């Protein structure tokens, strides 16, 4: 479990290779080493074909796909953003890893989600828990939906390629 600070940073999903995954898993327990791999290798390469920027919409996306909070979700929808294996334990950065099997399940879980379903979930988020007064509105929902569509496309492609996935965000 990790601490989420209000007014989250910009999140990015990266569809990574088996070699990159092995490096990250070998570094688990050493937050500095994990960050070096993420920042100096994965982020630095910025492989546009295998990433999805979520800006700050990742927060609302996760809440819509889970119980409305930032707790780790369960099952494929809960894995989409903050689920999976936590590779970084500090409060300054989040790195969550999904296996290719989990990526496939997330892709399948996201496929049928409609804009109406997402809107209903979005407006059930507790404004006090969201931490940004006045942000739960139609304009922010449209922003969230636009990024969600990119996330869904990302998972479809990552699943088709059998890739691992990490979600990263700095706090």
Residue ranges and their predicted role:
Residues 1-146, 150-153, 157:
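Acidic (Asp/Glu-rich) sequence patches and key acidic residues
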Residues 166-167:
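Cysteine-clustered segments with highest specificity for TGF-beta superfamily mature ligands
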